[in-house]
């Protein structure tokens, strides 16, 4: 896992899902001296997956950003190693594999496999989906179990994974996925100040349908 840096402020950024233009727009609005934490699922779904990956990785190499692993990155790593995508013998159903091709995907394999699972700040932690409440280890797919049982032990937990209409707060959990690839926004949250900066994601006519998630669980405040 990745520890806190010496930079004074951080911005935790929700699921990019191939929305490279939104990443560029967000970067224009965030101070160049602050550190960026991309909380996973940068790949799949959107129209500019390769561009988003290259841009984010460039920021990582510059020391400005951390890219956390999401379930989509883990699924691609698993698929490349076993030759199956979601139980099917063809990887062509994976958006990233289709966009990049086999050779380029395999060039990304080790980088994606070694992405950190969490970033620890002072009084807060960022991770993709939350923590397994039975072990309190990062879990890339957890939802309701973590939301219901989080006891505040890590301070604020800033997560992506579950899209909603705006940044939501739920008993010490801050949910920053605002559905960029679904016609919503790409949002960044500053855990030191509580500020939110959002830019438009895909235009509604180009976006994917929002998954059927329970609105009462997503609304927060």
What positions do the PLM features span?
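Acidic, His/Gly-rich catalytic cores of divalent-metal-dependent hydrolytic chemistry
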Residues: 5, 149-221
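Divalent metal-coordination and catalytic microenvironments
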Residues: 15, 36, 41, 70-71, ...
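A short acidic-Thr-Gly-centered motif at the start of a beta-strand
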Residues: 1-8, 28, 57-60, 117-120, ...
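Active-site environment of divalent metal-dependent phosphoester hydrolases
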Residues: 17-22, 44-47, 72-78, 119, ...
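Active-site-proximal beta-strand elements of phosphoester/diester hydrolases
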Residues: 10-17, 124-130, 174-176
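N-terminal active-site segment of His-dependent metallophosphoesterases
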Residues: 1-55
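Active-site neighborhood of divalent metal-dependent phosphoester bond hydrolases
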Residues: 45-125, 144-149
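A general structural motif
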Residues: 7-9, 33-34, 62-64, 122, ...
């Amino acid at each position: 896992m990745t520890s806190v840096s010496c930079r004074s402020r951080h911005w935790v950024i929700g699921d990019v899902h191939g929305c490279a233009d939104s990443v560029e727009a967000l970067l224009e609005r965030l101070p160049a001296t602050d550190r960026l934490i991309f909380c996973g699922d940068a790949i799949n779904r959107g129209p500019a997956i390769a561009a988003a990956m290259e841009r984010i990785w460039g920021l990582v190499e510059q020391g400005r950003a951390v890219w956390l692993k999401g379930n989509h990155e883990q699924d691609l790593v698993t698929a490349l190693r076993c030759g199956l995508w979601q139980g099917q013998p063809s990887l062509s159903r994976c958006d990233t594999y289709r966009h990049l091709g086999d050779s380029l995907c395999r060039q990304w394999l080790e980088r994606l496999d070694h992405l950190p699972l969490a970033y620890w700040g002072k009084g807060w932690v960022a991770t993709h989906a939350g923590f397994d409440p039975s072990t309190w280890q990062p879990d890339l797919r957890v939802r309701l179990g973590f939301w219901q049982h989080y006891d505040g032990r890590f301070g604020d937990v800033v997560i992506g994974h579950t899209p909603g209409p705006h940044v939501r707060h739920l008993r010490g959990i801050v949910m920053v996925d605002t559905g960029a690839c679904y016609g919503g926004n790409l949002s960044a949250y500053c855990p030191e100040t509580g500020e939110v900066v959002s830019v438009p994601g895909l235009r509604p006519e180009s976006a994917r349908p929002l998954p059927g998630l329970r609105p009462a669980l997503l609304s927060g405040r």
